[in-house]
Amino acid sequence: MSAQSVEEDSILIIPTPDEEEKILRVKLEEDPDGEEGSSIPWNHLPDPEIFRQRFRQFGYQDSPGPREAVSQLRELCRLWLRPETHTKEQILELVVLEQFVAILPKELQTWVRDHHPENGEEAVTVLEDLESELDDPGQPVSLRRRKREVLVEDMVSQEEAQGLPSSELDAVENQLKWASWELHSLRHCDDDGRTENGALAPKQELPSAVESHEVPGTLNMGVPQIFKYGETCFPKGRFERKRNPSRKKQHICDECGKHFSQGSALILHQRIHSGEKPYGCVECGKAFSRSSILVQHQRVHTGEKPYKCLECGKAFSQNSGLINHQRIHTGEKPYECVQCGKSYSQSSNLFRHXXRHNAXKLLNVVKV
C-alpha cells in the first residue's frame, strides 16, 4: 500500500497541531540526524499516533533536500515506534495494527481508534465486542433492537465528531451490520443471495431512528452490490432506503467552524482540539475519551469476569472472549482463508495466517 493511500484511508484529525509542530521543530533542530542523546524525554512527547500520521503524510516538498527528507522521516518513525522503550515484538505489532486498521471500512476505523487498541489482538477484540453487541442471539429481540439503536446513535456521534459529511453519517447503521457479517464470514451464497442450502437470506430491516443514504466514494450501503470478504457474500438490494434531507446542523465549533446536528457530537468533536480524555483509571492513571472504554479497562485491575461459559464454567472479562472460547466446545471455525482453505475459530488467527501468505509473496518478489 502506498503512503498516499494509507494517508487517504487512515488520517485522523489530530489535536493541538501548533504544539505538535513546535515539538517536532525543536526535536529535529536538536537532532537533525536522528542520533540518540539529544532526544526529548519520551514521557513528554505527544501521543505516538500524531507522529505516525506525520510520518505517513510527510511529503518531499516539506524538506530542502533528499538527505533532510530521509533524516526527518527517520526521526518521525522513531517518535512513532519509540525503539528506546518498545521491544522488537511491540514495534512489529504497532506496524501490523496500523495496517489492520487501514484495511477496515472507514466507519470501523473510527470505532476501533476510539477504543485506542495497543496491538492487533485488542483491535480484534473491539470488533468482536461490536459484533456481539449487534447480534446476541441470547437476548430478546426488543432488547437487541434497542442496543443496536444505541450503538448506532453512539457511532453517529463519533463520526460527526470527526467532521464527516452528513450524507456519510446516515450509512453508519448499515456499516455496523456489514461489520458484523464481515467479521463472522459464516455464510456462503451465490449472486442471488442464496445460502449453501439454497435458502434466501432474510431481508434486513433498518431501525427507524437512522435513515440510509448513498455514500459518495465508499461502498453504497443503501443499495449494496455483492461484496465478498473471504468467502462471504451479501445479496444485492437487501436494505430498504429512507431519506431525510431536512436534517439540520445547529451546533458550531468555535475553534474550526464545523457544524453538528447534535450537541453531544460537538462535545466529542471539541476534545479533538483540547485533547481531553475525561475518564481516568484510578488504578494506573490511563485516561479514555469514553466511559464505556474505561469500564472495560478497569476489569484488568479488578479481575472481574462477568461472562461465564455454561459448558465448563470458565469466566471471561469480555463477551468476545466467551464467544471465542465457546468455539472450543462447538468446533466452529467460521474464519476461512480464501487462498488455501484453512479455517480458524478466531479472526485474529486468520489475520496472522493471511500475513504469512503475504510475507511469502513478498519474499518471492525480493528473490526475483
Curated annotation (Swiss-Prot):
Domain SCAN box: start-end pairs: 52-134
Modified residues (Phosphotyrosine): 335
Main localization of the protein described in the UniProt heading: nucleus
Covalent link location (Glycyl lysine isopeptide (Lys-Gly) (interchain with G-Cter in SUMO2)): 22, 27, 147, 177, 236, 277, 286, 361, 367
Molecular function per GO: DNA-binding transcription factor activity, RNA polymerase II-specific; RNA polymerase II cis-regulatory region sequence-specific DNA binding; sequence-specific DNA binding; zinc ion binding
Gene that produces this protein: ZNF24
PROSITE patterns linked to this entry: SCAN_BOX, ZINC_FINGER_C2H2_1, ZINC_FINGER_C2H2_2
Protein name: Zinc finger protein 24
Listed InterPro entries: SCAN_dom, SCAN_sf, Znf_C2H2_sf, Znf_C2H2_type
